[in-house]
């Protein structure tokens, strides 16, 4: 596929709460240190703006752009409904894809008008949750998708008498039926599959300081076609 510009698009997929925002935060830090210009995009940003406007017009005071953990869980079903219904009612189910595509194209146009090169510009899309979003990354921008899973260590009993203890990985389950259906479809199209242990950190900014998580992100980035060859230049922490 021949692109009209040299911008690199990387999408991050995985269940809600698997750490996609943390992944993007760490990736941004790594790429910036390696002299790349990073743009952060999310399909959910457009969704949240629409939901916020609807709530405001209906007299609600909830700010969906600044939610506590409890508020996120309470409002998540509304986000899922709003996002899915917009897809259902749009041509080809591309409502959110088209919004983010327009946003990215505007950024590129502004850069070109300003005489900026897009050669070392990386667009990180933090919430690729549907197959048509992954297809957009691949087909429209010749980009790649990284799929992320989160797990926790748990002791389990086993053996013949049930007295033996084993430390096992327990992966996060889907938070809702929609993600249980869509995430496996996205995962099979992902170019890089990675996983990490949940650290229980309060924010992405705090979690991004974890060296073990930084190494996971670094390895994933260097496994994409954009950085894995020495001739191109692998990334470093």
Model-found features: residue ranges?
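Short, well-ordered beta-to-alpha junction loops that form the rim of enzyme active sites
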Residues: 127-130
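ATP-dependent small-molecule kinase phosphotransfer cores
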Residues: 43-121
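Small-molecule kinase domains that catalyze NTP-dependent phosphoryl transfer to phosphate-bearing small molecules
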Residues: 16, 99, 133, 138-140, ...
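Extreme N-terminal, non-catalytic leader segments
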Residues: 1-10
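Conserved lysine of the Walker
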Residues: 20
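Hydrophobic anchor at the beta1->P-loop junction of P-loop NTPases
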Residues: 12, 125
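Post-Walker A helix-loop "phosphate-sensing" segment adjacent to the P-loop in P-loop NTPases
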Residues: 29-39
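Hydrophobic positions on the alpha1 helix immediately C-terminal to the Walker A/P-loop
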Residues: 23
